[in-house]
From Swiss-Prot:
GO terms for cellular component: cytosol. This is Ribosome-binding factor A. Monomer. Binds 30S ribosomal subunits, but not 50S ribosomal subunits or 70S ribosomes. It is found in: Cytoplasm. The gene is rbfA. Belongs to the RbfA family. The lineage of its organism: Bacteria, Bacillati, Cyanobacteriota, Cyanophyceae, Oscillatoriophycideae. InterPro entries: KH_dom-like_a/b, RbfA, RbfA_dom_sf, Ribosome-bd_factorA_CS. The keyword Nucleotide-binding does not apply. HAMAP family: RbfA. GO terms for molecular function: ribosomal small subunit binding.
Length: 128
């Protein structure tokens, strides 16, 4: 088992390398259907499993198509990681959609909606 600092370092290396692969090397047309960015990599403590969280911008059809393309290219990504990062064993790669940005945007929209619907507070109670 690796210590937390090593896990963090390897995780950031994987994030950087996969981001480069998404920009330049993955040739699957489905991956280009939506704009994709790597938001986080969750690496197990034994460095055997990597969950790669991606944010996909586009409509639902483009998101589904992009996720299918990413899942199909997981073997290529794993092989490339094995060549670029010197590890004893290359982790198994799983792509997951990260919808935290959309949830955060929706929460901000709801808070703005509540703020505009609330009547202004009166200071009449302080005058008494």
């Amino acid at each position: 088992m690796a210590n937390d600092r090593r896990v963090s370092r390897v995780s950031s290396l994987i994030k950087r390398e996969v981001s480069q692969m998404l920009l330049m090397e993955i040739k699957d047309d489905r991956v280009g259907a939506g704009m994709v960015s790597v938001t986080d990599v969750d690496l197990s403590h034994d460095l055997q499993h990597a969950k790669i969280f991606v944010s996909i911008y586009g409509n639902e059809d483009a998101k589904a198509e992009t996720m299918a393309g990413l899942k199909a290219s997981a073997g290529f990504v794993r092989r490339e990681l094995g060549q670029r990062i010197r590890l004893r064993r290359t982790p198994e790669v799983v792509f997951l959609e990260d919808s935290s940005l959309e949830r955060g945007d929706r929460m901000l929209h709801l808070l703005d909606h509540i703020k505009t619907d609330r009547p202004p507070e009166d200071d009449d109670s302080e005058e008494e």
